[in-house]
Amino acid sequence: ALLVDGKIVAAAQEERFTRKKHDADFPGHAVEFCLQQAGIRVEDLDHVAFYDKPLLKFERLLETYLSYGPVGYKSFVKAMPIWLKQKLYLPRELNQGLGHRYKKRYIFTEHHESHAASAFFPSPFEEAAVMTLDGVGEWATASFGYGKGNDLTLTHELHFPHSLGLLYSAFTYFTGFKVNSGEY
């Protein structure tokens, strides 16, 4: 999404352009679309935000694997190099995806703050209660708060391993659907 003076002027998902469901590649087409809609260039951007805090999420992953060790050792050894490569080099990937034209710092918001913002800010409400639920972000699995004008405040969180979203995913898997895809 692209905001100008606190107002959403454009938003798009990369999968709409590439026709690949849950496209995990850099959203280059979506970025270009949003910039064109606003009539600006990457160099004109004041901030670029990313939807989670990778190092906070790494803390949860590491703590979870260590608490269940040595049971999860094989999956840890397999998953961590891939995950670390993706997340530790994220600023470099963002720079590359933006053609090295953005010269300022990136902002990393917490996962549930991103969900809450994507629900509240495009809504027609000036003021509203906000609730997010999913499997897990960094540590939070649910968050509660309120939005008013251009301000969003999350006041309470439920933390991993307590998660209605993961329970939902377990039932999704049990009934034969693909987790994080077949639910909707």
Task: For every predicted segment, state its role.
Residues A1-Y184:
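Short acidic/glycine-rich loops and adjacent helix/strand connectors
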